Amino acid sequence: MGRKKNRGAKFAEGDRVFYFAPRACEENGGHPPEGTVLRATRKSGYWQYQVQVAGTDRITTWDEMLMGAVDV
């Protein structure tokens, strides 16, 4: 997958990320869910990312303020 990064976005397409929202962690057994960025969009002055959650076929939208990169 190409590593397309939108200007000003924190994460690029294909980046592996964690989501630190309290509810998401609670739903994932107390651990932050991991996913892969599919697309970034700017909405109301901040970035949102469509992410495919690891280990599932679920695609969801995460806010940049609650995301962190996976160091590899």
Predicted segments with their positions:
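Basic/aromatic-rich interaction segments and small domains that mediate binding to polyanionic partners
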Residues: 2-4, 12-70
